[in-house]
Amino acid sequence: LKAQPDGEMKDGFVEVLVKTNGAYEGLSLDMSVLDAAGNTVALDGQYANEDHRTMLRAIVAGADLWSSEHPTLYTLVLTLKNNGAPIEYISTKFGFRKVEILDGVIRINDRRVVFKGTNRHEFDCRTGRYITEEVMRDDLEKMKRANMNAVRTSHYPNCPRWMELCDEYGIYVIDENNMESHGTNRSTIIGCPQIPDSRPEWEKACMDRIQALYERDKNCTCVVCWSMGNESLGGETPKKMYRYLKNVDDTRFVHFECHGDPEEQSLSDVQSKMYAKPQECEEYALTRRDGRPYLLCEYTHAMGNSCGSTDEYTTLWDKYPCLQGGFVWDWVDQSILTKDDQGREYLAYGGDFGDEPNDGHFCGNGLLFGDRRITPKYYEIQKLYQYVDFCAVDPVRGQVEIKNKYLFTDLADFELYWCQCSDKGVFRDGVVEVQLAPGEKVLDLELGRPCNTEFYLNLELRTKEKTLWCPAGFAVAKEQFVIDAFANTYDELVADAPLLVDDTYGSLRGMSDDVNIRFERRERNQLVSIKVGGEELLQGPMRFNFWRALTDNDRGTRAGSRLGCWRDAGDTPGIYNNTKWSIENYKILDGGKKVVVVSGATVCTQPECKGQVIYTITSKGMEVDMQFFPNDALPEIPEVGLLFELPPDFENLTYLGAGPEENYIDRCNATQIGLYNTTVTDLYTDYLKPQECGNRTGVRYATLVGQKKVFSLVAEPVMELNVSHWLPKEIENTWHGKDLPPVTKTVVRCIARQQGVGGYDSWGAHCNEKYKNKTDKTYRLKFQIRF
C-alpha cells in the first residue's frame, strides 16, 4: 500500500499491490477508499492477474493529509470476488503523507520537520514485556501532551497494535529492527570480533529480521523511517540490509547509527549520533556537512535527576535546518514493582532479586517512573518541545510576539489565556483569539500596572475542543514574563524593642520578651538555638553546606571521589573535613534594638577556605549574610549555602519562587515564578535510586508551618531553597526510597548556588561549565529569618 499526495499536496494517490493464491481464473478485486465519516471517496476494480499480483489505483480528490498534527486516516476495503461473488474482505486504515530528503533536509508533506522524540522500551513494571492497550494509550496521551511527535522503537519492532495507535494519535515512528550487538567491537575474548560486520554466518539471520520488519510494517503510515538496528556498526551485512530497504521502499528514509564508520553514507540516509554535545551538533551544521540531515537518535540521558541543558539542543534545531531533532533516552524506567520482606511495595532494579551480574539501577532512565507517574524532567521536555514561542516585545505594555512553529496548523483551534498576577494573586486576566497561520505576529494585551511590586505576565495557549489525547482547555504552550523583578521581596527588619545581650557561661545570647537567640561559645561557636515564644526552632546548629546527595550524573563523573573534599566540609567539628567557627566580634546598635554578630569560619579542605556569616538580630527577626571564599586550587563545589534543621512537624511550605515542579539552574525552562503551597513530603522526588531532589530556584520568600510554629525566610534578592526530611548524606546512602530513615527532622538548605544536574550523558559528561560552581569566585547568600 502506497498512499502519497501529489506535488501540490492536494490530491491523494493510492496504489495497492494485492497478492492472491491459487487459481486466478474468475477472480476479481474491488477497492474502496472511505473517509473518516464512512463515505466512499474512491473506487477501483481489476481482474486478478496470472502472476497473482494485481495493482489497484485510485485518486482521492482534495485529500486530507496525515501528519503528527492532523493524523487523518482513511479506510481501505478490498473485496475478493469469484465470478462476481464476494469470498473475502480485507480492510486497513492508512493516511496520505510524503516523506523525502530534499537538499539535505527531511521533509514531511513538503515541510521541514523537527523530530521531537523519545526512545521507548516496551516495558511495564507490572506486566514486564507485555503492554496492555490501556498502557499504550496512556503513553501516547502523555507523549502528545508533552508536545512529542516521534518515537524510536528502541531497539526492536513493537507490538502491531502500538503501530496502529501511532497511526491514530499521530506519531512519527522510527521503526527499529532487532539487531543489537553493542560492544562486540570491544570484546576481549579471542576469536569473538565485531558482529555482524561482514561475517557470512550472520547474514541470513540479519536479512531475515530486516525483511520481516519491512513486510510487517510496510503499510503503517506512522513509519517514516526504517532503523536497521542499534550500535551494531558497519560491514557488508549492514550494507546489504540498507540496499534491501532502499530497493523495496522509496517512500521512507533509512537510519543507522554507525558510530563513525568510514562508509556510513552507504549505511544510513541521515547522520545519526548518540549523546553528542550541543557544540558537536553545531559544529556539524557549520563545518562538517556531508549532505545528510543530522538526528540525535539518543540524547539528554534522563537517568535519575537529569535533563539539564536540553534547551541547548532545541535552540540549535530552530537555528540550523539540517539539525532535525532528537530522541530522549528514554521514556519510562524499566523497573519492576515488587514487595520486600515487610510487604512494602517498591520499584526494584538490578540486584534486588539476587541476580548476578546486573546493571544496577541503570534501567532508570525514564521521563516517567516505572509505574508511569510523571517525573519533573517530563515538564522540561514538554516546555522545550512546545510548538509556539512567545517573545517579549514590550511585556510591560502587553506587547508579545507569538511564533507559530506548527507545520500544518494555524492557531484558530486554540485560545490564548493571559493573566497578570503577583504574590497577592491574579489582578487582571483575559482570553483572546489567536488566528495565526504558521508564522509570526505581535499581540497587544490590555494590561494594568500595579504599583511598586514585582508582577508576572503569564500566557497559556489552550485547546478549544477536546481531542483524542487531551481535554478542552489543555495548555499546549506556556510562557511567563517577570516585570519589575524583586521589587517587593526585601524590607529592613523592624526593630521595635531592645534586646538583652548576655555573653556569659559559654554562650552569646540576644533576648527579648519573646525571642532568645543563642550562639555557642566554647567549641562550636555557631548559632545553635532560636527560641520564639519559648518554643525551640533549631534542632542543630546552622552550618555551611557544600554537598548534595549524588545524582546519577554525578556518579557518572566520579563526583563522589573527585569532589569528595566537599562532602563533610560544612559539618561541625569532627576528625575529618569540617568547618571551624569563631565569633569574631559583636556590636549592639540602635540603642540595643540590633545586635550584629560576626562569625568567621575556616573550612578545613586542603588547602583551606574561608567564610563569614554576619547575623543582624532584632526582636522581629534575624538577617543572615553569608560569604564564602573558596581556594581556586580546589575542584568545583556541588553546592554553596547554609543548612539547618527544624523539628519534623514543619511540614507545610508556602514559597514565592520557581515552580511548581523541582528545578535547577540548568533545568528551569518549564517553571514559572508564583506563590506555591506544598508539603515537605511532596517536595521529595522518588527517583529509582534516592538522590538530590526537590530543589527550587528563584525563591523570594518562603514560610514553613509546624503544628504550633511558623518559620519564615525572605531572600535578598533570591536564593535556591531545598527542604527535606533527610540530610543529603542520608539520601545518598540509601538504595531505595522505602529504606530512608524515619522522619525526625526537617532539613532546610538555603542555597547561594547549586550546580546544574547535567544530562548530556550519565557516564562521564559534566554539566555545562557555566552551571558549575567554580572556586575562583566569591559566593554570597543573604536572607532574613522572620519571627
Residue ranges of predicted features:
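Surface beta-strand/loop "capping" patches
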Residues: 1-23, 375-413, 492-512, 626
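Beta-strand-rich binding/interaction modules
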Residues: 11-47, 76, 399-431, 443-446, ...
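Short strand-edge motifs at loop-to-beta-strand transitions and within beta-strands
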Residues: 52-58, 441-445, 779
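Extended acidic/polar, glycine-enriched regions
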Residues: 17-101, 455-499
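Extended substrate-binding grooves/exosites of carbohydrate-active enzymes
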Residues: 85-401, 406-412, 417-425
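An acidic-aromatic loop/edge-strand motif
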Residues: 1-16, 20-27, 90-98, 369, ...
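Catalytic cores of secreted or luminal carbohydrate-active enzymes
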Residues: 343-401, 405-423, 441, 448-491, ...
